Amino acid sequence: FLGPAGVGKSHLAYGIIKSVSDRTKKHAMFIKLPELLARIRNDFGNEANTEQKWIARLSKIPFLVLDDLGQEKISDWSKSILFSILDNRNCTIITSNLASSADIESVYNQAIMDRACKGVDKDHGFRFDGMNSMRRKHY
């Protein structure tokens, strides 16, 4: 889901995975990507929660939403983690304030973009164009 802040991308993504999880009785996880990366970084040196264990756990969750792609501090490390998560998944919803898939590819790389769009053709992505923030009062 791509579009400006406040237009309902996260709300819709949460509603979708909650509905699917409730119907299928399978686990789902909604997490902001910056928060996820902070948790992984905070676990450095913790044998119980290595990067590989985080990635393995996230790979097993049937339905995952990675919220706010592009809001994290982008580094080679964060790109590597994101690549590993997406490379091991099939059903992932991603929300971002970046305007297009080309923007995502330019910020990250083609390999990450390819994995982020796994199983999705160009007609099945959601763009929230021309919408104003729902958080602001409009006069």
Residue ranges of model-derived segments:
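Short beta-strand-centered segment that lines the nucleotide-binding/catalytic pocket of NTP-utilizing
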Residues: K25-L37
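Loop/turn-to-beta-strand initiation segments
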Residues: K26-H27, K60-F63, N88-I94
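Short basic/glycine-enriched coil/helix segment immediately N-terminal to the Walker B
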Residues: Q52-P62
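Walker A/P-loop nucleotide-binding motif
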Residues: F1-A13
